[in-house]
Curated annotation (Swiss-Prot):
Binds 1 Ca(2+) ion per subunit. GO terms for biological process: arachidonate secretion; phospholipid catabolic process. It comes from Mus musculus. One of its GO terms (molecular function) is calcium ion binding. The lineage of its organism: Eukaryota, Metazoa, Chordata, Craniata, Vertebrata. Its cofactor is Ca(2+). This is Group IIC secretory phospholipase A2. PA2 catalyzes the calcium-dependent hydrolysis of the 2-acyl groups in 3-sn-phosphoglycerides. Testis PA2 may be important in the production of prostaglandins, by the release of arachidonic acid, which in turn are necessary for the contractions of the seminiferous tubules and the testicular capsule; they also seem to decrease sperm transit time through the male reproductive tract. The gene is Pla2g2c.
Length: 150
């Protein structure tokens, strides 16, 4: 069953545009932190990855909660932050956001800003990253049922 879930998640993201925010976020995490977004952050704590509930377990998990909140605000404006394309560059460790297509601006630009804040947060908290909080198949029973309000 878990294998099927992973396969379906993979297929969904594989079929998403290669310029989507999802793929750009993966690249940004790798460039800024030196870590894989999937292998280091997906399933970390109570908020990293799909969904989220309970209280963040540490500073890294709070980065994910803040990222979820940022995306939630964009959805209220009618954006689709996981799908809105954007471009970014990194010069001397500084991420600069831009848009790829006029139709995805300003949503793509705003999604990039959410992602940028998240990866900077991850970088600031690398020293306190706790491998014990990372689960490949997150069920998150320790997180409770309620979602922390933004």
């Amino acid at each position: 069953m878990k294998g099927i879930a992973i396969f379906l998640v993979f297929i969904f993201y594989w079929t998403t545009s290669t310029l989507s925010s999802f793929w750009q976020f993966q690249r940004m995490v790798k460039h800024v932190t030196g870590r894989s977004a999937f292998f280091s952050y997906y399933g970390y704590g109570c908020y990293c990855g799909l969904g989220g509930k309970g209280l963040p377990v540490d500073a890294t998990d709070r980065c994910c909660w803040a990222h979820d909140c940022c995306y939630h605000k964009l959805k209220e404006y009618g954006c689709q932050p996981i799908l809105n394309a954007y471009q970014f560059t990194i010069v001397n460790g500084t991420v600069t956001c831009g848009c790829t297509v006029a139709s995805s601006c300003p949503c793509g630009q705003k999604a990039c800003e959410c992602d940028k804040q998240s990866v900077y947060c991850f970088k600031e908290n690398l020293a306190t990253y706790e491998k014990a909080f990372k689960q490949l198949f997150p069920t998150r029973p320790q997180c409770g049922r309620d979602k922390l309000q933004c």
